[in-house]
Amino acid sequence: MTAQLIDGKAIAANLRQQIAQRVTERRQQGLRVPGLAVILVGTDPASQVYVAHKRKDCEEVGFLSQAYDLPAETSQDDLLALIDRLNDDPAIDGILVQLPLPAHLDASLLLERIHPDKDVDGFHPYNIGRLAQRMPLLRPCTPKGIMTLLASTGADLYGMDAVVVGASNIVGRPMALELLLGGCTVTVTHRFTRDLADHVSRADLVVVAAGKPGLVKGEWIKEGAIVIDVGINRQADGRLVGDVEYEVAAQRASWITPVPGGVGPMTRACLLENTLHAAEHLHD
């Protein structure tokens, strides 16, 4: 069996097109365009690239985009004051603080300061709590994007054994909640898990988000399973690889996401989708 590719790039492009169309309709109806504020602290090269992509995405769909590029020594109090101002700004529907932050800043405190209805990353405890209570409002972007990718395969998730490799607050934990909502029986593995191979080999669906290249061996993948690889790791030769041993896994899986071009584009598209949702359903 050779797996079919889940083309995140194409699915994300289609989603951006739909969002741009809706923004055009809003303009024609005399409604304001959605607004996204992006806060970048310091000069981390990867963060600068991510933020540049997000601004380009906003431009493409016609959003108002406000950029706050702040020096690395910016204080916690100054950042909190900026977030407060953006919370009160009626032109802004979403506030994004680019992670990671410099060591002297408390990311949890800053993310919790964002009003839940402007938390378009979906990281606020209120939004995670709503997802856990089966009443999602603004959903974490990567898990939300993965659910869209899974829907594109036409696979029926009800009753599937799903394994999430990695238990981060950004992907693993909310991913487990999304899969529960989708009708899966979910196992979350983490650094204390014994015999990872055994868990993975029994899974109908594997979502890997550990940040370790080649952690999940291709031979562990059950024949016909769906494989979603969230990992993006740069090798010494400059190549980008995922957390799954792709070549072998692709011979066993029914569907698999490539790296790059799988999950990453959907995360960005879902940030736009959340911002549009906030504008239309939470702020208009």
Curated annotation (Swiss-Prot):
Belongs to the tetrahydrofolate dehydrogenase/cyclohydrolase family. One of its GO terms (biological process) is tetrahydrofolate interconversion. Keywords: Amino-acid biosynthesis, Histidine biosynthesis, Hydrolase, Methionine biosynthesis, Multifunctional enzyme, NADP, One-carbon metabolism, Oxidoreductase, Purine biosynthesis. GO terms for cellular component: cytosol. One of its GO terms (molecular function) is methenyltetrahydrofolate cyclohydrolase activity. It comes from the Bacteria. The keyword Hydrolase applies. The keyword NADP applies. Disulfide bonds: none annotated. Signal peptide: none annotated. It catalyses: (6R)-5,10-methylene-5,6,7,8-tetrahydrofolate + NADP(+) = (6R)-5,10-methenyltetrahydrofolate + NADPH; (6R)-5,10-methenyltetrahydrofolate + H2O = (6R)-10-formyltetrahydrofolate + H(+). Catalyzes the oxidation of 5,10-methylenetetrahydrofolate to 5,10-methenyltetrahydrofolate and then the hydrolysis of 5,10-methenyltetrahydrofolate to 10-formyltetrahydrofolate. This is Bifunctional protein FolD.
